[in-house]
């Protein structure tokens, strides 16, 4: 009788183990938003539409210098002192837009063989401001040796 109960308990636990889902969930929880919004320098920052994977402090400092070249954008960041031994920074920039209301969203998911970053570019609903903007999204993720794929 005890063997049957023990066997049922083992089977129950084995069927409820969702290690792959839990790993993905834990990886997604490791995504920390640093900043998202728009640059208002009409492209004067010199940042083209791109997806960046920043693994070194020097590259991060160079990006911050560019971002702050017109307006002090990094003042609104949740953090700028990144520990690159533990984290990688993901930065996505859209093209310069001729009006406001645009945004960029990221959905970052870790899988067993790669990290996938789904980039969604949103357009304004209805009327938008008549100012040139450049949407961006910057986040840090736990450092990994897995390849990073943008979609």
What are these regions (language model features)?
Residues 1-26:
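Bacterial Sec-dependent N-terminal signal peptides
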């Amino acid at each position: 009788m005890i063997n049957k109960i023990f066997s049922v308990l083992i089977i129950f636990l084995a069927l409820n183990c969702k290690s792959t889902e839990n790993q993905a969930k834990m990886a997604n929880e490791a995504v920390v938003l640093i900043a998202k919004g728009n640059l208002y320098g009409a492209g004067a920052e010199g940042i083209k539409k791109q997806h960046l994977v920043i693994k070194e402090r020097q590259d991060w400092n160079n990006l911050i210098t560019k971002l702050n070249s017109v307006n002090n954008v990094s003042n609104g960041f949740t953090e700028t002192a990144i520990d690159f031994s533990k984290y990688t920074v993901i930065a996505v920039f859209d093209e310069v837009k001729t009006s406001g209301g645009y945004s960029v969203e990221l959905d970052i998911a870790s899988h067993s063989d790669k990290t996938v970053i789904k980039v969604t570019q949103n357009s304004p609903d209805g009327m938008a401001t008549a100012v040139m903007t450049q949407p961006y999204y910057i986040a840090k993720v736990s450092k990994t040796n897995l390849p990073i794929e943008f979609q």
